[in-house]
Amino acid sequence: MAAPSWRGARLVQSVLRVWQVGPHVARERVIPFSSLLGFQRRCVSCVAGSAFSGPRLASASRSNGQGSALDHFLGFSQPDSSVTPCVPAVSMNRDEQDVLLVHHPDMPENSRVLRVVLLGAPNAGKSTLSNQLLGRKVFPVSRKVHTTRCQALGVITEKETQVILLDTPGIISPGKQKRHHLELSLLEDPWKSMESADLVVVLVDVSDKWTRNQLSPQLLRCLTKYSQIPSVLVMNKVDCLKQKSVLLELTAALTEGVVNGKKLKMRQAFHSHPGTHCPSPAVKDPNTQSVGNPQRIGWPHFKEIFMLSALSQEDVKTLKQYLLTQAQPGPWEYHSAVLTSQTPEEICANIIREKLLEHLPQEVPYNVQQKTAVWEEGPGGELVIQQKLLVPKESYVKLLIGPKGHVISQIAQEAGHDLMDIFLCDVDIRLSVKLLK
């Protein structure tokens, strides 16, 4: 029997040492395993001509996918496969993605399908929820408004069921679109997506005191025009409410006290909490209110109500299972290996834009133009991306680069990590800043 190699002996010794300290401490000690296994560093972010690399905060076994033998040996907990079973990656090659999108669906005989539209105010958390339902981040997420600029499509395929998610921009008024010179897609896409919807998910951020007390007039008009489409209410970030009585008031207001054709039963001793600005749970007959009635602040035709907490994945699992059960017999629209209809370049541009929104102040990120100069596979199979960031002011250049290049380095590092998780390959990303003349 051949003697074990030096690398194999070191690996066994390291694994045993990690196993002895326990999985919680072990997570911070597993990073060096990549060198023991002979793996290359998974992400190198090169910014404005200066090399930048940061350690990947995950075990080396992640490079071979979830649920590896190394994780099981170390006692690491595995993700719930019932929430995100076999989540496909997105190809970094546009031609491969295009071929996959037109490939004949590999559906079973008893296939079922459901098209779901997510509607809500800007920054309500629609893209975050979409990513959670898909099991992989493919849509940009930011604390700033209008991160989603146009309709984006994601696909959930489990067993015989396929759910198609349409993540839309936050609904805005025509006046706001003109006043802020926003793209027309922000105004039109939520309405267009309703034309092919089987179910509408209305998302409300209950932590936002300015928007949580009522559905916007634009959203109510959209629901009224397509009233034949079933809808459900999802109240997001309920863990942010310190007093749960506020949650009851909001539920009564947003549903006009009616869910699935039945009036909500509230205790007579229930009183409004100061500062919520919600009406009494006692409401009029919803059928007697006209569409243009200024007193209408809710929608009395929701079939179900779901409450999501950022602290619990079980809430997302419950919503996902509901969507799967609502699917009707019909042919799939996509192959089971499809996760999103976006091109790799679109995903990359959106992710970088997300980081711009997160790291740049006020109006600056909205005035940055992105131009991809290089998109190719490197000699080691890594994805090489070079993108130019074009700005109209010298002051924007300084803000984007930051002291000693810190800001643009951070943007590239975070974008590279996200893209790695999307494409499941090494990513070499280079960003440069140029002043528009």
Swiss-Prot record:
<dbReference type="GO" id="GO:0005759">
    <property type="term" value="C:mitochondrial matrix"/>
</dbReference>
<keyword id="KW-0225">Disease variant</keyword>
<feature type="region of interest" description="G4">
    <location>
        <begin position="236"/>
        <end position="239"/>
    </location>
</feature>
<feature type="domain" description="KH type-2">
    <location>
        <begin position="360"/>
        <end position="437"/>
    </location>
</feature>
<dbReference type="InterPro" id="IPR027417">
    <property type="entry name" value="P-loop_NTPase"/>
</dbReference>
<dbReference type="InterPro" id="IPR005662">
    <property type="entry name" value="GTPase_Era-like"/>
</dbReference>
<dbReference type="GO" id="GO:0019843">
    <property type="term" value="F:rRNA binding"/>
</dbReference>
<keyword id="KW-0809">Transit peptide</keyword>
<feature type="domain" description="Era-type G">
    <location>
        <begin position="112"/>
        <end position="330"/>
    </location>
</feature>
<feature type="binding site">
    <location>
        <begin position="167"/>
        <end position="171"/>
    </location>
    <ligand>
        <name>GTP</name>
    </ligand>
</feature>
<keyword id="KW-0699">rRNA-binding</keyword>
<feature type="region of interest" description="G3">
    <location>
        <begin position="167"/>
        <end position="170"/>
    </location>
</feature>
<feature type="transit peptide" description="Mitochondrion">
    <location>
        <begin position="1"/>
        <end position="43"/>
    </location>
</feature>
<keyword id="KW-0999">Mitochondrion inner membrane</keyword>
<keyword id="KW-0496">Mitochondrion</keyword>
<keyword id="KW-0694">RNA-binding</keyword>
<feature type="region of interest" description="Disordered">
    <location>
        <begin position="271"/>
        <end position="290"/>
    </location>
</feature>
<dbReference type="GO" id="GO:0003723">
    <property type="term" value="F:RNA binding"/>
</dbReference>
<dbReference type="Pfam" id="PF01926">
    <property type="entry name" value="MMR_HSR1"/>
</dbReference>
<feature type="binding site">
    <location>
        <begin position="120"/>
        <end position="127"/>
    </location>
    <ligand>
        <name>GTP</name>
    </ligand>
</feature>
<dbReference type="InterPro" id="IPR030388">
    <property type="entry name" value="G_ERA_dom"/>
</dbReference>
<dbReference type="GO" id="GO:0005829">
    <property type="term" value="C:cytosol"/>
</dbReference>
<keyword id="KW-0472">Membrane</keyword>
<dbReference type="InterPro" id="IPR006073">
    <property type="entry name" value="GTP-bd"/>
</dbReference>
<dbReference type="GO" id="GO:0000028">
    <property type="term" value="P:ribosomal small subunit assembly"/>
</dbReference>
<comment type="function">
    <text>Probable GTPase that plays a role in the mitochondrial ribosomal small subunit assembly. Specifically binds the 12S mitochondrial rRNA (12S mt-rRNA) to a 33 nucleotide section delineating the 3' terminal stem-loop region. May act as a chaperone that protects the 12S mt-rRNA on the 28S mitoribosomal subunit during ribosomal small subunit assembly.</text>
</comment>
<feature type="binding site">
    <location>
        <begin position="236"/>
        <end position="239"/>
    </location>
    <ligand>
        <name>GTP</name>
    </ligand>
</feature>
<keyword id="KW-0209">Deafness</keyword>
<keyword id="KW-0342">GTP-binding</keyword>
<dbReference type="InterPro" id="IPR015946">
    <property type="entry name" value="KH_dom-like_a/b"/>
</dbReference>
<keyword id="KW-0690">Ribosome biogenesis</keyword>
<keyword id="KW-0547">Nucleotide-binding</keyword>
<feature type="region of interest" description="G2">
    <location>
        <begin position="146"/>
        <end position="150"/>
    </location>
</feature>
<feature type="region of interest" description="G5">
    <location>
        <begin position="308"/>
        <end position="310"/>
    </location>
</feature>
<dbReference type="GO" id="GO:0043024">
    <property type="term" value="F:ribosomal small subunit binding"/>
</dbReference>
<comment type="similarity">
    <text>Belongs to the TRAFAC class TrmE-Era-EngA-EngB-Septin-like GTPase superfamily. Era GTPase family.</text>
</comment>
<dbReference type="InterPro" id="IPR005225">
    <property type="entry name" value="Small_GTP-bd"/>
</dbReference>
<dbReference type="GO" id="GO:0005739">
    <property type="term" value="C:mitochondrion"/>
</dbReference>
<feature type="modified residue" description="Phosphoserine">
    <location>
        <position position="173"/>
    </location>
</feature>
<feature type="region of interest" description="G1">
    <location>
        <begin position="120"/>
        <end position="127"/>
    </location>
</feature>
<dbReference type="GO" id="GO:0005743">
    <property type="term" value="C:mitochondrial inner membrane"/>
</dbReference>
<protein>
    <recommendedName>
        <fullName>GTPase Era, mitochondrial</fullName>
    </recommendedName>
</protein>
